[in-house]
Regions:
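Rhodanese-like catalytic fold shared by cysteine-dependent sulfurtransferases
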Residues: 1-26, 33-65, 73-111
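Short, surface-exposed ligand- or partner-binding patches at beta-edge/loop junctions that are enriched
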Residues: 68
Length: 111
């Protein structure tokens, strides 16, 4: 991440898993509500990408946030928005829920 805070880190499964296990990052699932309810990374909160795009200042993110979607594309857009809003440590989960599921890692169901 640059000193000016104009970029985010794009990390894959093993690095993301370590960050989540460390407990210092907020995990934000930007998928649609029906996708989130069907299964999500334990502890992830759902903030749909369209909500972020419609009202960026209306959504609060922690200083250390991991964004996740199905494969890492929608979450990259959310990551760009978070950087623009001044979030200091932004991480995009490249591979997303698809990689998490395929690795057999636990998922929570419901909201």
């Amino acid at each position: 991440m640059s000193e000016t805070g104009t970029s985010f880190r794009d990390l894959k499964l093993n690095e993301i898993k370590a960050l989540i296990e460390g407990g210092e990052y907020d995990v934000v699932d930007v998928r649609e509500g029906w996708e989130h309810v069907g299964g999500h990374i334990p502890g992830a909160r759902n903030v749909v990408l369209s909500r972020i795009l419609a009202n960026p200042q209306g959504v609060q993110f922690n200083e250390r946030t991991i964004f996740v979607c199905e494969v890492g594309e929608r979450s990259a857009v959310a990551s760009e928005m978070a950087v623009a809003l001044g979030v200091k440590d932004v991480v995009n989960f490249r591979g997303g829920h698809k990689a998490w599921r395929e690795a057999g890692l636990p998922l929570e169901k419901g909201s």
